[in-house]
Regions:
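Short alpha-helix in the alpha/beta-hydrolase fold that links the catalytic acid
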Residues: 327, 341-351
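Conserved acidic catalytic loop of the alpha/beta-hydrolase fold
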Residues: 149-178, 191
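Catalytic active-site module of serine/aspartate enzymes centered on a nucleophile-bearing elbow/loop
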Residues: 355-396
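Alpha/beta-hydrolase-fold enzymes
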Residues: 1-52, 175-176, 189-293
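Short beta-strand/loop motif that positions the catalytic acidic residue
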Residues: 325, 331-333, 337
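Short, surface-exposed "cap/lid" segments of acyl-processing enzymes
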Residues: 83-152
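Short beta-strand immediately N-terminal to the catalytic nucleophile in serine-hydrolase-like folds
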Residues: 180-182, 207, 332
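Gly/Ala-rich beta-loop-alpha elbow adjacent to hydrolase catalytic centers
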Residues: 181-186, 190
Length: 396
């Protein structure tokens, strides 16, 4: 009997830069070309190769996550643990908890804070002197915080759709029509919910939350363009370790997340803000993995294809984009932020169908360890920016 030898997979030409040949526009295209049009067996071999490489790396990174959390607990013993305001659990699920603050009745406009699923939600309430939540409470608002929990292996396939579904459950649990408030990726998720279900929100206040993606949308764009398809991360990692996201962030914006952080340590010591710097540093050690599908959706659907800004993203069976965001809209931008610059926000803001729109600027300050977090914890932000945000929220 003749034995058929397996076909070898075709290789890419090595002369892509020779005269007359168009070089690939980005590494992402090259990776896609590796599998495009090839037999299923070849494609499957490449997925298995990704898993065999990333699997052991993932185990190492998960150990690094555990080590960093242990380091954080040591800092807790040094007096740097968060000091949150009293709250109660309004809703508990395996994926998130809804915390409610203040009086259940007689409070003012309800506000639902959608925390970013990266790191921990207590950055919104580090302590008495670094807490937007306490400022909202002092203004008489009914405050709720959607706090994401560590994803389980069953959550690997939880993408943007699932996260919007969970926000929907949290909105229901507030028992009212709240203003949604979010920072960074938490704000992006809140925007997706409001664009899909505008009738269920009284307004949307976003703090340095990316809405427009693509080549002109900040430091992450070149990293995404030079990366293989993000589904490889889902296949290789399952749950993407927090340390991996730290490395990607530092590679994308080293000035903001590496060099300026160390410079801020020195200036914090000189300006009497060392404790705040160390509190934020302790928070950065509270690593949290993300579902592989969520990472893949953010990278592919948002950053690579900019589908939300283009109005091409489908959430719960319907397209969402600027044209479906019809709730009052507030955006806080930092024009000097490398990670989420104004160009990642203002094009969407201008295109949004919201009848009432407002734009505020925050230009950073020393003593907050990370510029991107300064708007949540900085004394300047809390005394100058947040009173304007609260006034806007209270008048929805």
């Amino acid at each position: 009997m003749d034995i058929q030898r397996p076909r070898t997979s075709p290789t890419l030409p090595l002369d892509v830069h020779r005269k007359g040949r168009e070089p690939p526009r980005s590494r992402s295209q090259t990776f896609e070309e590796l599998v495009a049009g090839q037999p299923w067996g070849v494609r499957n071999q490449r997925w298995l190769a990704a898993r065999s490489v990333l699997g052991p790396v993932g185990a190492t990174l998960r150990s690094a996550d555990s080590l960093r959390r242990a380091q954080g607990r040591l800092l807790d013993r040094a007096g740097l643990a968060p000091q949150p305001a009293p709250s109660r659990i309004q809703l508990a699920t395996p994926a998130f908890r809804l915390r409610s603050y203040g009086q259940a009745t007689g409070a003012g406009r309800p506000v639902l804070i959608v925390a970013a699923p990266i790191k921990r939600a207590y950055i919104w309430d580090l302590g008495p002197n670094a807490s937007p939540i306490r400022l909202l409470l002092d203004a008489g608002l009914a405050v709720h915080l959607l706090e994401w929990l560590d994803p389980s292996p069953a959550d690997v396939d939880a993408g943007l759709d699932r996260y919007v579904e969970r926000i929907s459950a949290a909105v229901d649990a507030t028992g009212d029509t709240p203003v949604l408030l979010g920072h960074s990726l938490g704000g992006t998720l809140a925007a997706l919910f409001c664009a899909r279900y505008p009738q269920r929100a009284a307004g949307l206040a976003l703090v340095e939350a990316p809405l427009h993606f693509g080549s002109d949308a900040g430091a992450f764009a070149p990293v995404v363009a030079a990366s293989p398809p993000a589904e490889w991360l889902q296949e290789g990692f399952g749950l993407v370790p927090g340390v991996f996201l730290d490395v990607v962030t530092a590679a994308a914006a080293p000035r903001e997340f590496v060099f300026e952080r160390y410079a801020d340590l020195w200036t914090s010591a000189m300006s009497g803000r060392l404790r705040l710097h160390l509190q934020v540093l302790r928070w950065t050690m509270d690593e949290c993995a993300l579902p592989g599908r969520l990472v893949a959706d953010v990278v592919e659907q948002l950053y690579r294809k900019d589908r939300f800004h283009r109005g091409e993203l489908v959430i719960d069976g319907s397209r969402v984009g600027p044209m479906t965001l019809t709730v009052p809209l507030l955006n806080v931008i930092d024009p000097l932020d490398d990670a989420i610059p104004a160009t990642a926000i203002t094009p969407f803001h201008e295109a949004a169908a919201s009848p009432h729109k407002a734009l505020l600027e925050y230009r950073g300050e020393r003593g907050t360890a990370l510029r991107h977090i300064g708007v949540l914890v900085g004394p300047g932000a809390l005394t100058a920016t947040w009173p304007q945000v609260i006034d806007w929220v209270a008048n929805r």
